[in-house]
UniProtKB/Swiss-Prot annotation:
Regulatory subunit of the probable trimeric SNF1-related protein kinase (SnRK) complex, which may play a role in a signal transduction cascade regulating gene expression and carbohydrate metabolism in higher plants. InterPro entries: AMPK1_CBM, AMPK_gamma/SDS23_families, CBS_dom, CBS_dom_sf, Ig-like_fold, Ig_E-set. Keywords: Acetylation, Carbohydrate metabolism, CBS domain, Cytoplasm, Nucleus, Repeat. It is found in: Nucleus; Cytoplasm. Preferentially expressed in dividing cells, as well as in shoot apex and flower buds, but expressed at a lower level in differentiated tissues of roots, and leaves of rosette and inflorescence. GO terms for cellular component: chloroplast; chloroplast starch grain; cytoplasm; nucleus. One of its GO terms (molecular function) is maltose binding. This is Sucrose nonfermenting 4-like protein. The modification N-acetylmethionine is found at M1. Belongs to the 5'-AMP-activated protein kinase gamma subunit family. Residues 165-227, 260-324, 350-408, 432-487 form the CBS domain. One of its GO terms (biological process) is regulation of protein kinase activity. Subunit of a probable heterotrimeric complex consisting of an alpha catalytic (KIN10 or KIN11) subunit, and a beta (KINB) and a gamma (KING or SNF4) non-catalytic regulatory subunits. Interacts with KIN10, KIN11, KINB1, KINB2, KINB3, HSPRO1 and HSPRO2. Interacts with BZIP63. Interacts with FLZ2, FLZ8 and FLZ13.
Length: 487
């Protein structure tokens, strides 16, 4: 029932006279194969854990431990995990759980006998003395460590250029600004890309970017003029006409009072990565075109790449992968640093509340919330606030499947139905095939979060409670860079 019992003394307890304490370790969060490893196994042995009879999601094992402090971690289905509901610390090896086994007249430094008495756990008549979870288990980040880490990241980004973000091979799609909106809509869907730069043949230059927010605003605008969206309405609007209309809606005018579309935010291949990141953050865009011209007047520009925060973060992770100790903040749990947006009951208060959706909410209300909250995605939760899915701006392109935009009313379709439509849609290329919800725990280290966000197509991580998947917060690429750059 409990699996094999491990003796941490390795047979030396009799000679040393040390008392061994049977200690039960429990992993209550499920899995197929679960192992335990720790300082008491010299981190070289993985002890198999057995499912609890009648409760296959709970794994346990008993180990005989010597008195003193021990560190341990769980190896669950090929991934190292720790239990955030037990005492844990952060170190060079990542986040590990800790346990203190008392011997005769032993009291851990910083704890009174009364404190230890309160932290006893009665398990099958085996008393386990552990550090009190209410005590500060996570080391505080010093201001010196923070500034040192930010300085080193700033130096790295200031000495690397956008040219280093260019892939060895690939393609970048640009759209003619005179294309009908409907055709552009279908191209983005069929190619599986969220956005594309706009080319104006008359001016001989790139003039903007078309992305998911444009389609959200278009569908909401057209939806106010009738009960259904028609292909004819989308067919009569070119991208150029839409951009001009968008400027009018946003009250962007030139000196003559004419609508003036927002100028293109772009970078050159030799701009440093810090400037590229700042342009993305300051202009609140998902990516910026990397454009090169060999002529001083900028004529005959060449579109090389779309630079994103994900690519820059991948550069940071790659550079510091084997020297993480030079960035003290990397091993900090995300719950201990001012990063992301959290629900009010978790972490520090935030001036920006965390938006969530219920699956039965209308698609129209979801799109309105995306625009009003100025976010790129919203977690979809059940009545217990547990994560079900996530609705993102880029999901709007799923309405191009079978011309669904011409057959639905935004206030009649639910978020659940829209997500189902997106799952049924299978564009031949692109990033939309694969895992939708990317999650992390509040106890995960910053470096673990950064490495996940550096993967292509991952723009945010939803922070969930272990086991229940109750949403605790969300961390975006923008959040990480604002923290790393001290903005």
């Amino acid at each position: 029932m409990f699996g094999s019992t491990l003796d941490s003394s390795r047979g030396n307890s009799a000679a040393s006279g040390q008392l061994l304490t049977p200690t039960r370790f429990v992993w209550p969060y499920g899995g197929r194969r679960v192992f335990l490893s720790g300082s008491f196994t010299r981190w070289t042995e993985h002890v198999p854990m057995s499912p609890l009879e009648g409760c296959p999601t709970v794994f346990q094992v008993i180990c005989n431990l010597t008195p003193g402090y021990h560190q341990y971690k769980f190896f669950v289905d090929g991934e190292w995990r720790h239990d955030e509901h037990q005492p844990f610390v952060s170190g060079n090896g990542g986040v590990v759980n800790t346990i203190f086994i008392t011997g005769p007249d032993m009291v851990p430094a910083g704890f009174s006998p009364e404190t230890l008495g309160r932290s006893n756990m009665d398990v099958d008549d085996v008393f386990l003395r552990t550090a009190d979870p209410s005590q500060e288990a996570v080391p505080r980040m010093s201001g010196v460590d923070l500034e040192l880490s930010r300085h080193r990241i700033s130096v790295l980004l200031s000495t690397r250029t956008a040219y280093e973000l260019l892939p060895e091979s690939g393609k970048v799609i640009a759209l003619d600004v005179n294309l009908p909106v409907k055709q552009a809509f279908h191209i983005l869907y069929e190619q599986g890309i969220p956005l594309a730069p706009l080319w104006d043949f008359g001016k001989g230059q790139f003039v903007g970017v078309l992305g998911p927010l444009d389609f959200i605003l278009i569908l909401r605008e057209l939806g106010t003029h009738g009960s259904n969206l028609t292909e004819e309405e989308l067919e009569t609007h070119t991208i150029a006409a839409w951009k001009e209309g968008k400027a009018h809606i946003s009250r962007q005018y030139d000196g003559s009072g004419r609508p003036y579309p927002r100028p293109l935010v772009q970078v050159g291949p030799y701009d440093n990565l810090k400037d590229v990141a700042l342009k993305i953050l300051q202009n609140k865009v998902a990516a910026v075109p990397v454009i090169y011209s060999s002529l001083q007047d900028g004529s005959y520009p060449q579109l090389l790449h779309l630079a994103s925060l994900s690519g820059i973060l991948k550069c940071i992770c790659r550079y510091f992968r084997h020297s993480s100790s030079s960035l003290p903040i990397l091993q900090q749990p995300i719950c201990s640093i001012p990063l992301g947006t959290w629900v009010p009951r978790i972490g520090e208060s935030s001036s920006k509340p965390l938006a969530t959706l219920r699956p039965h909410a209308s698609l129209g209300s979801a799109l309105a919330l995306l625009v009003q909250a100025e976010v790129s995605s919203i977690p979809v939760v059940d009545d217990n606030d547990s994560l079900i899915d996530i609705y993102s701006r880029s999901d709007i392109t799923a309405l191009a499947k079978d011309k669904a935009y011409a057959q639905i009313h935004l206030d009649d379709m639910t978020v659940h139905q829209a997500l189902q439509l997106g799952q049924d849609a299978s564009p031949p290329y692109g990033i939309f095939n694969g895992q939708r919800c990317h999650m992390c725990l509040r106890s995960d280290s910053l470096v673990k979060v950064m490495e996940r966000l550096a993967n292509p197509g991952v723009r945010r991580l939803v922070i969930v409670e272990a086991g229940s998947k109750r949403v605790e917060g969300i961390i975006s690429l923008s959040d990480v860079f604002q923290f790393l750059l001290g903005l």
